[in-house]
């Protein structure tokens, strides 16, 4: 399973852990329902954010959950799982982006994909995922051609990139794809006024996804001779870190403009966990599973109880369920940790 937002469940409050798992399992089951058992392989942590965003804006309803049967990944327990348009959009996006990842590995001739028969089979699978994602996207009013076009442009940009090419030129297609996916959640939730700030949050999330993937793969790519945006453009890690920190700040600013019915899980994933993803990629954080002992990672502070879902009420703004408003004491107050 892949994705940059990979929270350790010990850091989530019990309620948020259940919610997060509901969206993760909901994505997996939406893939199976619409595209067959094999499609579940593309289940990923970042895709479920699309489902989380949709529900956070529309509000959770009893119709938005169903009880799933036993699953080995849940120790054969039943569980409530998310269903509906948010989960289906997450499935469509996950299929298209997984297709892009497969084609990227084929282009790099990674492992067995260096063999022509295996590469040909992988290309057929990727093409099938593109078509499947397009069908589901169309049923939801989302044109996955935006994602496919971005993926296709990526190859051309990488071919032309070299020393001195701005790194953000290379990340632009990914930014465009994730901006479109995030923005469409506003339309599914019936909150079109949220589309613009969510597009901005999605654009910066895509930038982070691309940069963190490059940072984490840098040494392996150098050893195998695979293309890496940092190496190709001559970008030092310090500049990549600066761009990541700027993007983190931009995501928070964009989410302040979004009207959520309940933004707690969004806040945990896109404020706290996204910061931890950056720290992890750059080797500036660790993860402790000791109960009752908070620790500091980067700029994030783990609460003493081992969770950091916002407590009852709203620590950042007056609107219930909206953790991105001005901090207590007005705009001049220090930012939350």
Pin down the residues of each PLM region.
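Short alpha-helical scaffolding segments that buttress acidic/His motifs in well-ordered protein cores
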Residues: 178-181, 202, 269-273
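Intrinsically disordered, low-complexity Pro/Gly-rich regions
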Residues: 288-337
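Membrane-embedded alpha-helical segments that form the functional core of polytopic membrane enzymes
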Residues: 198-208
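Conserved beta-strand-loop-short alpha-helix elements that form
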Residues: 208-214
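Acidic catalytic motifs of isoprenoid enzymes
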Residues: 1-173, 182-200, 214-223, 240-243, ...
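Accessory, usually C-terminal, subdomains that scaffold auxiliary metal cofactors
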Residues: 218-282
